[in-house]
Amino acid sequence: MPSRFALQLSTLFFLGVPLVPAQAADVTIKRDEYGTAHVYASEVYGVFYGYGYAIAQDRLYQLEISRLSTQGQVAQALGKDYVNFDIGIRKNYSPASIKEQLAKLPQADKDILEGYAQGINKWLDEIDRNPAALMPKQFIDNGFTPQRWTSFDVAMVFIGSMINRFGDYNSELQNQQLLDGMIAQSGDKNGKALFEKLLSVDNPDAPTTVPKGEWQPSVRNGAYVPAKTKAVAQQSPKPLPLLALNDPTLAWESPKERAFSNIIVLGAKKSKDAKAILLNGPQFGFYQPAYTYSIGLHGAGYDAVGNSPFGYPMVEFGYNKDITWGSTWGAGDNVDIYRLELNPKNPEEYLYQGQYRPFEKRIETVNVKGEKTQQVTVYRSVQGAVVEYQPEAGVAYAKRRGWEGEEVATLMSWNKVSKAKNHEQWVDQVQHSAINVNWYYADNKGNIGYALGGRYPVRVQGHDNRLPVSGSGDFEWQGFMPFATNPQVYNPKTGYIANWNNRPAEGFPNPDQWWYSWNTADRVQTLFTRLDGRPAFTPSQAWDLMMEAGFEDPNARFFVPRLVKAAEHSDQATVRDAAAILAGWNYQDLDADADGRYDSAATPIFRTWLKHMLALSLGDVLPKDQVGKFLSTGHFTPGGGTPGSQNIEVGTKVMHQAMIATAAGKAKGFDLFKGKDVDALMLKALQLSIDELSAEQGPDAKSWHTEIAHTIYAPKNFLGIPQAGEKEQMNNRLAMNRGTENNLTVFAMDGVQGFEVVAPGQSGFIAPDGTRSKHFDDQLALYGDLKNKRTWLTEEDIKAHTVEEKTLTY
């Protein structure tokens, strides 16, 4: 058996740092009835060596596709169809920067990544000795073999799928095109006024996670400072092709995905039969194999259990004996786009501080299976990666990120959250997370807490963060706001914390994406209303609350009461009948009789009404080429499936905001309804819905129906790269607006208890003969039936539930 020192030699020099030899040591892996691995070791290296080994047994093909996807190397394995994808990925990150960060880590932190990598490689060695039984069938089917892993590979899976996914959202180029289009259609004044409605910087009535009055917006007064030089006008020099960021060489995914997360955290006074309760539902989408991987880490300062996306080297959603933690996307804006003026005599130079300077550039070689290699030039300005390069137009666009250079530090802070024993130690790790992710806390004393992570820039006054700004040097960031200015709260007066990617706190600015905003209408109200409706919750009641919220149409509560009232005195019987059906609806989209249709006729009535109401409100005020973005209701496709979650769409939020303002006589700026009576418009939309449904399904309103949608576990990862065979796709019968996984931690009076459901299952392994792992889909029915399974933390509980045990030596 090779020693740890020998195993490290294969990756010794990629960081250029000598590694210290160690004596051979043991790792014990114990698996429970659902295949969850609990790793025991006395060294950090050993703990993560066991983790890497275990996940390689279960998820090797997914791991390999994740490695290739996040580094832009898919074409070398899957062929020429992925060349443009690889080019886009290569442009979006700097391998040299990541390696430099890794090289600076202390040895104990290097051991996390190196141990994990060598654990994977240990399993690769075992496959080499018995490929006929151990090689995952997907490799055989696709004609390539897994490669050995390094620390860099381990880090890049986290960086590429978490930081470069949730931390990198930006639609400033699209926003500019949207503004230009509205000005062209409605004139300068009205176009800008409409833009302010669609992409408002601040909506004071948007619900917040930090209760109003428990965080002071004034702490962010330093977010903008006077310019040191005269700022240039923010104008788009030339119209760009519509939605330039949708170009396949630039897009990481659709700019409007259905993901994100929800959570409830209950403190001592809001918990019944418990000291504190945390229930998280991270919504990454639904995939085969499961997006998250369950793990227990025990030893060398770790004693935690939970799960983590892609099997990151950490417990991202979990607990130890003292605290529990969770997270959701925070949506704070710490990414900006800069417009660069190219030198007309040399387009590889750009204007900065009055002089043309050369771009940093590197040549990337893209290997292509069965084809010639391709080369691409990747540019970088002082602001960051060049994401749009148009030499023929004399312009380029660069992206500056608040987290750049802190990717590895963020990974390590997330890893060490699981070692915290109290709120102070938890905050000490969260403050080092550079991306815009919300973090949540509860402990065995009944305390609860929340903090928005991320580094947020100090911008120059006049910098509209929704639009690209000049990259000539006038709008450079002036530093970063301290963590203390991020919204946070400890033991709020409400006794609970809840979030569904809503606004963190009053005064915190809206996101800059055209497809995501914080308004009065927010799906988090489905949680707030239920939490406020009961003085305290048992753990099972908290679970039921989250499950029930997952079936509610998040739009309905904001429109149905007013629509019903408006229809009360209609002289049309069909309108009154439809309104009566809506009045009796609890906003739930269920299929209790399992006939493949949602139970209430209110579902088709409301969905069709919302479609028509959006068209009547927004259809003729937005440019033809852009209006479609804002007319979607966001509902799941009847009879089809969705790999993600459901939110209130921006068009719907803006329409609702305008309805409130009009009713209160406070409408300002652009009049969305053009002076029309809003109630009359609502009734017109209802009549159009009645006409449409009558034509399609007959005149009996009570018989109108909508086919159910399903929860699809897609065989492609979030980047659209196949990570499983097409025949591996599966589904739960009814679509649910809930977490990809759900995890529940209960600090009971006699200790901590954990529960989770991670569908379809722990393993994605299929043997060469087609035999699937027994844990391939053994949590699919649990998820569909709204149930969960226990997780285990103590040595006694783990021993009692161990069905398989293995000891490794490294």
Which stretches of residues belong to each language-model region?
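Gram-negative bacterial Sec-dependent N-terminal signal peptides
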Residues: 2-23
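Substrate-recognition/specificity elements adjacent to catalytic centers across diverse enzyme folds
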Residues: 25-288, 299, 308
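Second-shell loop/turn segments in exported
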Residues: 50, 97-111, 400, 412-417, ...
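Stable alpha-helical elements in mature extracytoplasmic
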Residues: 94, 98, 109-119, 410, ...
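Glycine- and hydrophobic-rich flexible loops that cap the catalytic core of alpha/beta enzyme folds
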Residues: 299-309, 318-323, 327-471
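Hydrophobic alpha-helical segments
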Residues: 335, 395, 435-534, 588, ...
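Terminal end segments
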Residues: 513-571, 575, 668-810
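Charged, long alpha-helical assembly modules
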Residues: 606-693
